[in-house]
């Protein structure tokens, strides 16, 4: 038996064994699979979300892998103000752990977990960075109603008519006026506007100063075949006109000779 035949038989046996082992693994995995409960499915979805955030963070991260590695969230639960300093990946990790606690019995939440949840929703970070009274008993600065409420009657009854409160616009509250001020622009927008105006003025001045002499020359591409064809047709027309004129002249000349002969 040659070496090529031995090699072919060995490859055939190896491929058959590999296929048999993969088929057995697939059957075992299929038998061991079971339907996940809603809690387990939610946990698996959270794991996939964290893994996706890790993958995205690893793509945009130019430093070490510490920025995409899980962190110890205990200091964040103890001091909620640290949440605003975390990157997007670590904030997602904290939110995931906090959501897992919220999905369970709310009565078992600790004060630290409640404070962290309140800080994430109403704390002085991001759009609410100037809300410095988040950890006090005072009402939020943009509360949509007055505190304390104005009572019209000292002894209200069940049949009293209740009137609608006057609307309170959040954009007019003192802490929100600067955020909703549309007359101001950020430096980046101003820079782009100034660059656009400069380019427009430069283009207008250049158009005025350049005039007709600076206009770009139009390149006309001539078709030599078509040009020669038109010239040939023009010559043929001229030749036909000349021939027709010559015939008319001969006709008139013969007519003159005829009239003279009659006289």
Swiss-Prot record:
The gene behind this protein is GEP7
Q: Write one Pfam family the protein is assigned to.
A: COX4
Question: What InterPro entries does the record tag this protein with?
Answer: Cyt_c_oxidase_su4_fam, Cyt_c_oxidase_su4_sf
Q: Does the keyword Transmembrane apply?
A: yes
| Family the UniProt entry places it in | Belongs to the GEP7 family.
Which regions span the lipid bilayer?
Answer: 188-204
- Transit peptide, start-end: 1-26
S-S bonds:
none
- Keywords from the named record: Membrane, Mitochondrion, Transit peptide, Transmembrane, Transmembrane helix
| GO aspect biological process, one term | mitochondrial electron transport, cytochrome c to oxygen
How does it sit in the bilayer? Single-pass membrane protein
**GO terms under cellular component:** mitochondrial membrane; respiratory chain complex IV
Q: Give the span(s) annotated as Disordered.
A: 232-252
Per the record, the domain of life is Eukaryota
Its recorded name reads Genetic interactor of prohibitin 7, mitochondrial
Q: What does this protein do?
A: Involved in respiratory growth and required for cell survival in the absence of prohibitins.
Chief location of this protein within or outside the cell? mitochondrion
């Amino acid at each position: 038996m040659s070496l090529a035949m031995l090699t072919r038989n060995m490859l055939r046996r190896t491929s058959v064994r590999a296929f048999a082992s993969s088929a057995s693994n697939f059957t075992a995995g299929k038998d061991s699979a079971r339907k996940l409960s809603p809690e387990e499915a939610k946990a698996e979805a959270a794991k996939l979300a964290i893994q996706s955030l890790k993958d995205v963070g690893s793509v945009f991260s130019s430093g070490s892998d510490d920025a995409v590695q899980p962190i110890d969230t205990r200091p964040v639960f103890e001091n909620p103000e640290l949440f605003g300093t975390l990157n997007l990946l670590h904030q997602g990790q904290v939110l995931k752990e906090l959501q897992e606690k919220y999905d369970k019995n709310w009565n078992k939440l600790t004060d630290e977990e409640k404070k962290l949840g309140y800080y994430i929703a109403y704390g002085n970070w991001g759009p609410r960075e100037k809300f410095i009274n988040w950890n006090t008993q005072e009402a939020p600065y943009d509360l949509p109603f007055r505190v304390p409420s104005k009572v019209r009657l000292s002894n209200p009854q069940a049949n009293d008519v209740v009137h609608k409160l006057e609307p309170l616009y959040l954009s007019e509250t003192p802490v929100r006026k600067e955020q909703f001020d549309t007359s101001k622009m950020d430096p980046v927008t101003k820079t782009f506007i100034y660059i656009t105006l400069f380019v427009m003025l430069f283009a207008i001045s250049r158009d005025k100063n350049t005039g007709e002499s600076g206009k770009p020359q139009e390149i006309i591409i001539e078709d030599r075949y078509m040009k020669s064809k038109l010239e040939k047709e023009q010559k043929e027309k001229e030749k036909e006109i000349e021939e027709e004129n010559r015939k008319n002249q001969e006709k008139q000349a013969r007519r003159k000779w005829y009239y003279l002969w009659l006289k």
